[in-house]
């Protein structure tokens, strides 16, 4: 059986490892380096360069050099090279092809299968895009796993005898994640995850670039940001300065002949201290604090519950980052494994688990964002809450919103907002062939199934006719770059507004339902209701209809309650008249054909217009 490789497909650098003799081994690339820049370049003669050679010539060929494409995964972003458009998946596949070739050269055999890691906070579209990139590169992706989980594996946490709670801080080239894992008896269970898919080492580089460019402009009146070749040289110098400041308190930035004007050539020769670098990047470090707090809170833990802290990603070499983590956790982070290599090593261990080479290890990851569907009134009804352990499967029964409805559209959303329109649309599909019936009668079972890769399948089944429809959520390619981390931030910002909107919809839905049930029951009772009582009810019905589409919620509630009480009174009178002599009356114990307020009849419809039950199958 051929080897299964573990790949850390990074924003700035990628790494590959394989299990040998029971241990993960990092595979060096054809240039002899243990990591490969995630850079692709196209030459004038049509040749394509990948990795270090592509990065080296980026200064002279900035227009046709693609960097940090991982930030665009799962979006509709396209790269235009000589009139041909490339998707992020295609560019990533070029990096994977290079990694695959290097692994094959090392192993001396063809490689067809891999485990690839992604940031824990990647959404469904981004995960699917990563899997597609592997397929394009000729790799069967056996599993997509979260980077922090892979890192914990690489640190040998599975060999611990006692239960441990691990705090994983992962700051890479373009993404940031923090995860809380509970480990014991070879089981790795992710308790919570949080992060920012648009924060990483690239942002630290940009701060230095801006500082150099602004200083140069102030001194010389020339904006280097308008010169692509000069800007590429600034990027290289900024990255080099950042790395040097991790071990030195000061570095020199020397860029001769950066540009020229009428007075002659211009040069950059300046110093950058670690103190100044820390000042420039303080806001970036601060952005990592809130996700740490949220992850702890979601896990139901305090910092005192944490046994060990792990740093992952090259950007964690920055002293200010290390200090921030130490200050927050009160613990010295573990530094036993190279932060650039540990994720690939963990992926290789997981590959070993899947092939049976590694025994007694079980990974239990979580889904980063809530999954649900749109229900009556545009409400997002959750089926699987964020931080639910995967793989998982959950079902819930819904119904129709109109009489005689023969089809329903299932709108699948992902996010933390209470209204469907404010969340990320993952897909839509239609279930047809529902037998015509009064609204609320058909039973439509919607099932969400998330596999171990975090990829979603959704199905809907009419329990009456047996008709079924389903969708596998694939990369929708319409994500904006910051959409995933905006989901939770917006949920907090608009939480109060969301609550009010949801309350408004629930009140209006209830009013509409009370009117519907009252008119239906009135029609069913026919002559049993006196003309005087019928007129009283119809007046109350009209009163509700007049206000139910307005914005005065108190007026809607009052009119609905008035109608309900009037109907109760008349219902009681009818049952009293029909009761047999000697019976106990039953006026207040019997059926309430129009009871729909949700306060007195447990069978009433709520905002999703149906009863439901939840079946968990993990």
Swiss-Prot record:
Which domain of life does the UniProt lineage start with?
Bacteria
Keywords assigned: ATP-binding, Chaperone, Nucleotide-binding, Phosphoprotein, Stress response
Gene Ontology MF: a single term: unfolded protein binding
Q: Does the keyword Magnesium apply?
A: no
Note whether Manganese occurs among the keywords.
no
Task: Give start-end positions of Gly residues composition bias.
Answer: 583-597
Region (Disordered) residue ranges read 576-618
Protein induction: By stress conditions e.g. heat shock.
* Modified residue annotations for Phosphothreonine: 175
Specify residue ranges for compositional bias: Basic and acidic residues: 601-618
Q: Which Pfam families match?
A: HSP70
Name the PANTHER family on file.
HEAT SHOCK PROTEIN 70KDA
Family named by the database record: Belongs to the heat shock protein 70 family.
Q: What does this protein do?
A: Acts as a chaperone.
Protein name (Swiss-Prot/TrEMBL): Chaperone protein DnaK
Q: Which organism is it from?
A: Clostridium kluyveri (strain ATCC 8527 / DSM 555 / NBRC 12016 / NCIMB 10680 / K1)
């Amino acid at each position: 059986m051929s080897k299964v490789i573990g790949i850390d497909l990074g924003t700035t650098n990628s790494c590959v490892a394989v299990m040998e003799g029971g241990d993960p081994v990092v595979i060096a690339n054809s240039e002899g380096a243990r990591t490969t820049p995630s850079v692709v370049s196209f030459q004038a003669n049509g040749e394509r360069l990948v990795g270090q050679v592509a990065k080296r010539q980026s200064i002279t060929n900035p227009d046709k050099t693609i960097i940090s494409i991982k930030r665009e995964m799962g979006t509709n972003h396209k790269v235009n090279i000589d009139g041909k458009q490339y998707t992020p998946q295609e560019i990533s596949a070029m990096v994977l092809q290079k990694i695959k070739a290097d692994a094959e050269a090392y192993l001396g055999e063809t490689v067809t299968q891999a485990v690839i890691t992604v940031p824990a906070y990647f959404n469904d579209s981004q995960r699917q895009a990563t899997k597609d990139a592997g397929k394009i590169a000729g790799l069967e992706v056996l599993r997509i796993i979260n980077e922090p989980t892979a890192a914990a594996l690489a640190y040998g946490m599975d060999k611990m005898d006692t239960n441990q709670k691990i705090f994983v801080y992962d700051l890479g080239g373009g993404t940031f994640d923090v995860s809380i894992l509970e480990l014991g008896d070879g089981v790795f269970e992710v308790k919570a995850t949080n992060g920012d898919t648009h924060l990483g080492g690239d942002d630290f580089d940009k701060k230095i670039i801006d500082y150099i460019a602004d200083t140069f402009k102030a001194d010389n009146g020339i904006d280097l940001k308008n010169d692509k070749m000069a800007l590429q040289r600034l990027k290289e110098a900024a990255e080099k300065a950042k790395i040097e400041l991790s071990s030195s308190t000061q570095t020199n930035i020397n860029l001769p002949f950066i540009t020229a004007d009428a007075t002659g050539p211009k040069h950059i020769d300046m110093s950058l201290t670690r103190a100044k670098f820390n000042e420039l990047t303080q806001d970036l470090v601060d952005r990592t604090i809130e996700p740490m707090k949220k992850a702890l809170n979601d896990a139901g833990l305090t910092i005192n519950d944490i046994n060990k802290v792990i740093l992952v990603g090259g950007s964690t070499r920055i002293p200010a980052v290390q200090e921030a983590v130490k200050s927050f956790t009160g613990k010295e982070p573990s530094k036993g494994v190279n932060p650039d290599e540990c994720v690939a090593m963990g992926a290789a261990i997981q590959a070993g688990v899947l092939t049976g080479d590694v025994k007694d290890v079980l990974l239990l990851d979580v889904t980063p964002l809530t999954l649900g569907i749109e229900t009556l009134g545009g409400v997002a009804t959750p089926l699987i809450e964020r931080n639910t352990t995967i793989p998982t499967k959950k079902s819930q029964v819904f119904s129709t919103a109109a009489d005689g409805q023969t089809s329903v559209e299932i709108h699948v959303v992902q996010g933390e907002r209470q209204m469907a329109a404010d969340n990320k649309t993952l897909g839509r599909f239609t279930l047809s062939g529902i037998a015509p019936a009064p609204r609320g009668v058909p039973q439509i079972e919607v099932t969400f199934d998330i596999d171990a890769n975090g990829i979603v399948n959704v199905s809907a089944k009419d329990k009456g006719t047996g008709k079924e429809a389903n969708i596998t959520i694939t990369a929708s390619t319409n994500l904006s770059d910051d959409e995933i981390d905006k989901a939770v931030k917006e949920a907090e910002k608009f939480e109060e507004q969301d609550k009010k909107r949801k309350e408004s919809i629930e009140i209006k839905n209830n009013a509409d339902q009370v009117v519907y049930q009252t008119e239906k029951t009135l029609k069913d009772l026919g002559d049993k209701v006196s003309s005087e009582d019928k007129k009283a009810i119809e007046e109350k019905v009209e009163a509700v209809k007049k206000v139910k589409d307005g914005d005065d919620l108190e007026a809607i509630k009052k009119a609905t309650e008035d109608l309900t009480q009037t109907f109760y009174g008349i219902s009681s009178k009818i049952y009293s008249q029909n009761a047999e002599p000697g019976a106990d009356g039953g006026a207040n114990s019997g059926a309430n054909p129009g009871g729909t307020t949700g306060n007195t009849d447990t069978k009433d419809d709520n905002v999703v217009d149906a009863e439901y039950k939840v079946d968990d199958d993990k």
